[in-house]
Each structure stands twice: as structure tokens, then as C-alpha cells.
Amino acid sequence: MHDNIFLPDAFLAQVQETMPSHLSMDEFIAACKRPLRRSIRVNTLKNSVEEFKQRAAEKQWDLEPVPWCDTGFWITRPESDTVKLGSTAEHMAGLFYIQEASSMMPVTALLKDNDDIEMALDMASAPGSKTTQLAAGMKNQGALVANEFSSSRVKVLCSNIQRCGVSNVALTHFDGRVFGGWLPETFDSILLDAPCSGEGTIRKDPDAMHNWSPESVIEIGDTQRDLIESAFHALKPGGVMVYSTCTLNHEENQNICHHLVEQFGDAVTFKPLGDLFENAEKALTKEGFLHIYPQIFDSEGFFVAKIRKNSSTTPPEVKKRLGKFPFAPASNKEAQAIEAELKSTLQLAIPEDNEFWIRDKEVWAFPKRMKPLIGEMRYHRIGFKLAETHKKGYRWQHEAIMALATADNPTCAELTTEQAREWYMGRDVRPDFSGKGETIVTYKGAVIGLGKWVGNRIKNGLPRELVRDGNLF
């Protein structure tokens, strides 16, 4: 129990005033004091739910389905399992993502009746839980622009995208308010999981409310209004967007959505979410939004609204300042050479939805759907880095292997548990078998990296920033 949890009187008064009458204040406070249940989402870009369930059963992990996400589960592990969930082999291989259950709901809402997305935007995407969930829902097809304003969070976003084998994402690093003017009516689907006061996160962080004040809520609301306007301008007519927060007050939730109607009138339609999952009506507002108080589903507090854009809007005028784009498309000859080498050395091929772009000695695989947006905005990175050229051919990259390879590849080398630990510590390994050339390294049927045979050992190709120490699986 989080008995020492800090709940300001002004916050409790606000909840008392706005919480539906059928919900109990005592139950709300009791729920806030209960530790949050641990939850994960299976990454279907790497394994199916059934395959993951088998792995979990072997490890005696108990999985309870999250009602609003087909790939989400609350997880309970044996007390004897002392390895941190993030240090398990399954997590490091990208087979699952540690994600709070409520935060899976926005992407579920965005994908409902919307399974043919060509161009999507995740406007505030770090650390990457919803970006990777959306990419999996898109099956790595189309294009997904993942934006993050915070410099310190871009690195972890990039790391999670690579770990999960996402290949259709372009990363940007801007204040989300620029999208409406820079890329007007460009995206058919937009997720705006807005920065907020975090009132719903108190079960995870007992100190979450120490910096809370009614004044800070109003200030954050001003930013949210700007962001939702920008998102709506960036949305194509006929497109849908989801606005979500992990907070509970109306100022940052219902009022922000109503502001959109005040600004754009009949161009806005709220899409009711009462049938999103079984018992969703328990959290349904009169507008059709989902306002999740922590006691309803024993989860974090959350808010989700789905909005359709019915007609065109006039975007703000902007002056773009863009430097020269440093990449050029690979020529047909270059592309054929890259494909042939990738096939002959690693028995791999680039997905049809990607194409080669060159920067100096680097070869990248961009989502084809990104091509119309090149030159319209600056990008932190697009797609994934496939290789670096050298005198004898190509030096394939770890992130490309994580995006392209599967454990049934004929070049795979399967490691033992001890060898896999050594691998993640950045050391070369010496299996009791031999091979030649570059090899895809696997552990328990999951790809974990790329190595190269040197005599009877596999030279470790794990990027330095991924090297781990301590208590691993």
C-alpha cells in the first residue's frame, strides 16, 4: 500500500466535484493507495500472442488479459524470479513492451474501424510505448511520424523503436505546435497523447502530485489547446485523431475537446467509444469519451477521446527554414547491388514498403510512404540504418537485423543461456559449433543481434550503448 501517497486537498475537492455520482470517493482514494498492477504488451512485430503465451507459461508468468488491448496483459511472476522485467531476455529481444494498461487504450481507439492507415502521426511519442503499439497495429506498413519535443527523451524513443523492430517510423524533434502549419491535412490518423498534469499516475509515483496546483492545470491546458488545434490542422478531411491524457480533471480533457468544436464547428465530430471493449460504458461520458478513474478498472487514471475531421480547415501560414536534405535515393544499380549482397550474406530482403537511400557511406531503408514528406520538414532519422559501405562490400547494422531477421534464418547461430548473457555484456562467444562469415545471433528462438565468425568464436556486434551488466535473465 502507498499509505504515504500525497493527495492535495484542492485535488480531492476537484475530483469530488467532477467525478460521476455513481463512483465512490472512498474507493477512489483506496485505489490511489494501491500499487499499480504490472502490465506488458506483446510486440506482434516479433512474435504472436500465442507464441508469447507459451514462453510465459514456461517461465511460470501468469498473464491476465487487458480487456481493451488484444496484445496487453497484466503480469504476475513467481517471487523467486528476481530478475527485473526489463532485464529478461524476452524484453531485451523486443518480444514485449512494459506498458501501463490504460495507456494501451488510445492506440486501440485509433485503430478501431481504421485498419488501413497510410500516414500516421504520434505527436508526443516518447518513450515509445504507443508508437511501437501503433507501428505493430500498422504491421510496419505505411508511414508513422513519431515526434518528441524533449531532447532527453528522443534517445530512449529511438532505442525502443529499434529494440521492437519497427521499420516504418520517421522521428522528428519539434514542438508539436508546428505540425498544423508545416504539414497541413497530411495525416489520415493522429495520436495526441498530450503532456499533462499526470493526476492519473499517482499509483505509479506516490510523489506525482507534489508539484500539482490548480494554476498549473490551467497553464498546461493552454498548451494542450494549441496542440490539439495543430493536430486537427495536420489531419486530412475524413481522418481520425485520438486525444488522450493520463490526468483526471475536465480542464485538460473534456474542455480541450470542446475547445476544438468552438474553433472548428461542424468540421469536428466526436466518435463514441462505448463499444471499444466490454464494460467500456462504465467510463463513458455524455460526449462518448472514456474518462477512466483508477477504481473502475483497477488501472491508472486516463482519458481518451476520438475525433473525426469532416471538412477542410485553413491552416496557419508559416515560413519554413530547411537545410539541404543529406540523403539521395539509391540508383537502380545501387539498389540491386545492396539487395544481392544482403541476400547472399544473410538471406534477408528489404520489405516492399521500404526503399534505399544513401548518405555518404551509409545505406538506409526509408518507408516509401515518407517520400512526399521529404523536404517538408527536418527529420531526426527516417526508417532504419541498413549498412555502411566499405572496400569489400557492406557492414550490416544491428538495428537492421532487429527489424528484418527472424530466428528461422539459415545463417542463425543459437546461443546457450550463459553465452547469451556474455553476448549482452558485449563479449565474444564460443559456441560448440562453427561457421563462416556474418551470422544472425539468436537465443531461445529470438533474434538478439549480428555477429561474425572469427575462427571458432563469434565476434560481438552489439552496439556499445546496448551492452548490459548485472543481473540478466
UniProtKB/Swiss-Prot annotation:
Main localization of the protein described in the UniProt heading: cytoplasm
MF GO annotations: RNA binding; rRNA (cytosine-C5-)-methyltransferase activity
Keyword hit for Transport: no
Gene3D superfamilies in alphabetical order: 3.10.450.720, Vaccinia Virus protein VP39
Domain of life: Bacteria
Subcellular location(s) per record: Cytoplasm
Database matches in CDD domains: AdoMet_MTases
UniProt entry tagged with the keyword RNA-binding: yes
Pfam entry (one): Methyltranf_PUA
Enzyme Commission number(s) of this protein: 2.1.1.178
Residues that, per the record, bind S-adenosyl-L-methionine: 124-130, 148, 175, 193
Name of the molecule in the record: Ribosomal RNA small subunit methyltransferase F
Natural source organism: Aliivibrio fischeri (strain MJ11)
Gene: rsmF
